[in-house]
């Protein structure tokens, strides 16, 4: 296999993703580094001149900056754990190609129209703050229409195609892949092999039923990748749920079916959402596996956080404040439904 490989991951100590990363690196015999993330580290980093410079460099007036890797790359470089000529190879956007962004219920009998696509896109990509629908709804819908132009939506396959096209154009290209700016910021090069043109062309020809729930990807990994010299990787925790007919796969199907059932009973669905949201509000600051809500003080976070926000909600405000600080208060007051609460905290 490939030699001279350094693997790294990051987050709170003991987080599940870090453990999976360690297992895979050790199984393949690669060097592995873990960078611990804490609320305190994030707060210290968020208010430095370096972070302000990174916002300007990475956002480039196109997207909010992607900050997830910045603590790790900074610390690895400062401690000499990666050579100056290192080339970073992240996995963007393998999950997207395999079908991870297609709504899981697109194999169910339901209406599939352009309106369905608009609703899915607004829910997924315009939900980080509670905004004034009368003011911003037409604007956001116009942006979505412009991105996909005159795409036809008439069944589940064409609706999934529209969902993915908008995601490719607006999320993957402008935000996810733009995360490589952090490597450049610290003087490193990068490659994104999963955006190879041949691979993209192949998945453009894959039918919905093989993309939905990542059916083709899972089957390929088990039957073609984790075989021969790499068959032992099938026993790692992170790969066991790829196997056909295993209990985890069955459990996931049951969860999806339960969610679909609850969606048809609004009272039960709303009750479940309220219970889940209350729990998140009281635990998110200290339990997030990346600890990154530490970019703001705990008391400010608890004033603002309603359960719908994520780190990009806050980074978006920070970024707007960096590029045009004077109008921020006016923008928040005009377009945010909880403007006074948000402004009092920030």
Regions found by a protein language model. Give the residues of each.
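ATP-dependent adenylation/pyrophosphate-handling site
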Residues: 1-28
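A conserved donor-nucleotide-binding helix/loop in the catalytic core
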Residues: 64-80, 165, 176
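Adenosyl-5′-phosphate
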Residues: 83, 127, 131-346
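Structural element of the ATP-grasp superfamily
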Residues: 21-25, 76, 221-222
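A conserved beta-strand->alpha-helix junction
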Residues: 18, 22-57, 97, 147-151
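Short secondary-structure boundary/capping segments
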Residues: 24, 49-53, 99-114, 207-210
């Amino acid at each position: 296999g490939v030699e001279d490989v350094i693997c790294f991951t990051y987050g709170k100590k003991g987080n599940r993703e870090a453990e999976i990363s360690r297992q895979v690196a050790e199984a393949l015999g690669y060097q592995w580094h873990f960078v611990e993330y804490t609320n305190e580290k994030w707060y210290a980093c968020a208010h430095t001149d370096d972070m302000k410079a990174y916002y300007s460099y990475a956002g480039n007036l196109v997207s909010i900056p992607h900050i997830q890797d910045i603590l790790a790359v900074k610390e690895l470089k400062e401690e000499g754990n990666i050579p100056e000529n290192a080339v970073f190879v992240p996995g963007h956007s393998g999950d997207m190609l395999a079908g991870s962004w297609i709504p899981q219920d697109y194999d169910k009998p339901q209406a599939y129209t352009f309106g369905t696509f608009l609703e899915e896109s607004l829910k997924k990509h315009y939900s980080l703050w509670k905004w004034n629908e009368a003011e911003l709804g037409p604007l956001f819908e116009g942006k979505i229409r412009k991105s996909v132009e005159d795409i036809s939506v008439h069944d589940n396959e064409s609706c999934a195609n529209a969902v993915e096209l908008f995601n490719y154009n607006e999320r993957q290209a402008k935000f996810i892949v733009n995360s490589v700016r952090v490597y450049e910021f610290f003087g490193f090069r990068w490659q994104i092999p999963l955006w190879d043109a041949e691979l993209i062309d192949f998945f453009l020809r894959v039918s919905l039923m093989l993309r939905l729930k990542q059916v083709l990807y899972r089957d390929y990994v088990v039957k073609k990748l984790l075989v021969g010299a790499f068959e032992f990787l099938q026993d790692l925790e992170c790969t066991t749920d790829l196997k056909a007919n295993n209990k985890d796969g069955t459990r996931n199907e049951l969860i999806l079916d339960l969610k679909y059932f609850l969606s048809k009973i609004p009272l039960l669905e709303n009750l479940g959402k309220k219970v889940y949201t209350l729990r998140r509000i009281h635990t998110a600051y200290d339990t997030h596996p990346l600890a990154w809500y530490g970019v703001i003080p705990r008391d400010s976070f608890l004033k603002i956080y309603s359960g719908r926000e994520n780190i990009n909600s806050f980074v978006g405000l920070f970024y707007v404040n960096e590029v045009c600080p004077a109008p921020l208060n006016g923008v928040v007051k005009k377009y945010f439904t909880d403007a006074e609460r948000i402004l009092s905290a920030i």
